[in-house]
């Protein structure tokens, strides 16, 4: 900023804007640190994967995979977890991602398939499809929160990865914007539910519309809110838990998760719970198993620990 800018805005305002610009530069440097670290290990390109619509009771589940690259000249200003952005900012950053990413892929899983597979299995299936759909094959895959086997590339889960990793944040934006646009289209078809407002998530207005009109074909019958509105109340084990109940683990075979032919360990890896941890730290419980499941035992997971 030159002397004319200082005179126009005042010294205090100029200092504040300089601090803000410096903070944003540091934030972006930190956001891209996983891609830089993996590039130094010879693991490029890196794909990030995330979904939108997991907790909605209507509409599709949308999964995106994005490869950004580690070149600092190609960093996307303002990139962040989609939940931290305004709708206008998401649209702007979405356009930047689509035009500047090395590769991107989107998978839309309709509500009927979510009901058939279950939300978690549908999410895993969508992530596999999204990575397989990339025009550039990734050397490494980073996922948000839990690991995915059967990706034909080594990968790791990152706690709160959509906040800590650039390519996962980009995937979250692409998935969210894509799904929001689809929900606006569904609003035109089913205006009585106001899908354009709540995007299929449970709100007081959505509950009232369900009570008044019943569910439409885009509602997920596997969700208790929809089953109540439709007059069907099959009780599930998960609905017996009280608010103070803690998670437990069952013995026996893991639930089968659809995946590519020949992808060993898909069910067991999908059943592994993700460990809690601070944002931007790799999930300790899954790290070594991820490398083993994805066929890369030559690179210890500890190489990717980033302070």
Curated annotation (Swiss-Prot):
It catalyses: Endonucleolytic cleavage to 5'-phosphomonoester. InterPro entries: RNase_HII, RNase_HII/HIII, RNase_HII/HIII_dom, RNaseH-like_sf, RNaseH_sf. It comes from the Bacteria. SUPFAM superfamilies: Ribonuclease H-like. One of its GO terms (molecular function) is manganese ion binding. Its EC number is 3.1.26.4. A divalent metal cation binds at residues 50-51, 144. Residues 250-280 have a biased composition (Low complexity). Manganese or magnesium. Binds 1 divalent metal ion per monomer in the absence of substrate. May bind a second metal ion after substrate binding. Residues 44-235 form the RNase H type-2 domain. PROSITE patterns: RNASE_H_2. Endonuclease that specifically degrades the RNA of RNA-DNA hybrids. This is Ribonuclease HII.
């Amino acid at each position: 900023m030159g002397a004319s800018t200082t005179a126009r805005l005042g010294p205090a305002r100029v200092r504040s804007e300089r601090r803000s610009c410096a903070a944003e530069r540091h934030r972006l440097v930190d956001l891209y640190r996983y891609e830089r670290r993996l590039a130094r290990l010879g693991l490029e390109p890196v794909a990030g994967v995330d979904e939108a619509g997991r907790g909605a009771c209507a509409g599709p589940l949308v999964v995106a995979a994005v490869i950004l690259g580690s070149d600092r000249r190609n960093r996307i200003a303002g990139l962040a977890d989609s939940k931290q952005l305004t709708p206008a900012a998401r649209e702007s950053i979405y356009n930047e991602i689509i035009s500047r990413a090395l590769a991107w892929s989107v998978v839309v899983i309709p509500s009927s398939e979510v009901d058939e597979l279950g939300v978690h299995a549908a999410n895993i299936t969508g992530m596999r499809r999204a990575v397989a759909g990339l025009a550039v094959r990734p050397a490494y895959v980073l996922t948000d929160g839990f690991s995915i086997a059967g990706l034909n590339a080594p990968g790791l889960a990152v706690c709160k990865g959509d906040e800590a990793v650039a390519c996962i944040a980009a995937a979250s934006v692409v998935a969210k914007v894509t799904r929001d646009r689809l929900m606006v289209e569904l609003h035109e078809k089913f205006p009585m539910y106001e899908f354009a407002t709540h995007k299929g998530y449970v709100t007081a207005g959505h509950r009232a519309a369900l009570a008044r009109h019943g569910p439409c074909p885009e509602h997920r019958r596997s969700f208790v809110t929809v089953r109540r509105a439709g007059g069907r109340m099959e009780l599930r084990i998960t609905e017996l838990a009280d608010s103070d109940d803690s998670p437990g683990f069952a013995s026996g075979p893991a639930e089968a998760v659809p995946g590519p032919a020949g992808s060993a360990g898909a069910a067991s890896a999908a059943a592994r719970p993700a460990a809690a941890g601070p944002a931007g730290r790799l999930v300790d419980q899954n790290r070594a198993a991820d490398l083993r499941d994805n066929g890369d035992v030559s690179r210890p997971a500890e190489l990717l620990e980033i302070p």
